[in-house]
Amino acid sequence: MKKVFVGTVICFSIFLLTGWSLAADTIKIGAFLPMTGAVAAYGQDANNGIQGAKEMRPTVLGKKVEYILVDTKSDKIEAANATSRLIEKDKVVAIIGEMISGNTMAGGPIAEKAKIPVVTPTATNPLVTQGKKYIFRVCFIDPVQGDIAAKYAFNTLKARKAALIVDKSQDYCVGLGKFFKDAFIKLGGQIVAETFCVTEDKDFSAQLSTMKPKNPDVLYAPNYYSPVALFTKQARELGLKAPVLSGDGAQADELIQIGGKEVEGVAFTGHFHAKAATTKLAKDFMALWQKKYKAEPNAFHALGADAYFVLLDAITRANSTRGEAIRAALATTKNFEAISGRLSIGEDGNAVKPMVIMVVKNGKFDYLTTVNP
């Protein structure tokens, strides 16, 4: 009887060490993404990218991956609720999401408390990972993005006077605007106007009437695609011809659909362009995408897929589905050959990786250059 009891304890201990999910037929990975609402384009594209990645690699540790998606409706409260559901009801071992910083920060603390790792494809605000052990990202952070954008404006566009329009309702936009502003001033530039909006705004006449008399050399709009498109369109209609520069939030097809020919020439910092792809994983992913959709993948497709691949790499190296083990593996990701380029992730949860600069040209996103870390 004693031998049976000891054997049971040993088996149970091994079971705990390797993770509960290993006893199941599948390994559950969740995602909380904005499939509807103001930034639905990001979530829909990332989800398609994840589905493509899952098609390329449907198993991990010898088991099928079960992918569970919950719509955040582009809302912070819904993002928190989605995170709770994935952890408490669906019993996932890790989570992908969210796409924007504010929503990621709404769900992050819940996952942190439960010790469930989260990998965000595109939440770039530094606060997303600050002070967290279980939150990671496969994108660059806004201080880097703002600095590169300021250098591009100052050195390439030869801008000395910048005007800003910042979406004050979004953490991402506020942070990126500040980082650009600080970097531009440090370079010797001047901020001649700083105006604000919210994501739902459609009329930017008040902001433009403040900017135009200042005769700026560049207009920096660190916002999501809809306000960037509408702002640019109205700026051109008002006769304000200064170049418009934005961040990674602008890279959605909807920017061109909403802005039309008026967004020609809009440049922005971003994560991925097919012309800049160099890794084998990128080439394999693009081949899959071409076969399925007869098109090139965009940044949100690529980063959604990267989040999935990085998670599976961590689970494989950990040889476990325990949250603590996956977290430790994520924090020691070194030179992973991702779709968006070679990346490393440290204990701070942040990815060190290349950045690309793109421009709208002939109704498409055209590649300009790559900036390496």
Language-model-detected regions and their locations in the chain:
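Segments of small-molecule ligand-sensing domains
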Residues: K291-H301, L312-K364
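Short, low-complexity disordered leader/linker segments with a strong preference
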Residues: M1-K28, V60, N372-P373
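Short, solvent-exposed amphipathic alpha-helices that sit
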Residues: Y42-R57, E78, V118, Q145-A149, ...
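Extracytoplasmic "Venus flytrap"
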Residues: G30-G49, R57, V70-I77, M99-G102, ...
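Extracellular/periplasmic periplasmic-binding protein-like sensory domains
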Residues: T232-A305, T316-N319, V359-K361, F365-N372
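Extracellular/periplasmic bilobed ligand-binding domains
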Residues: A111, G177-H271
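An alpha-beta-alpha
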Residues: I135-T199, V218
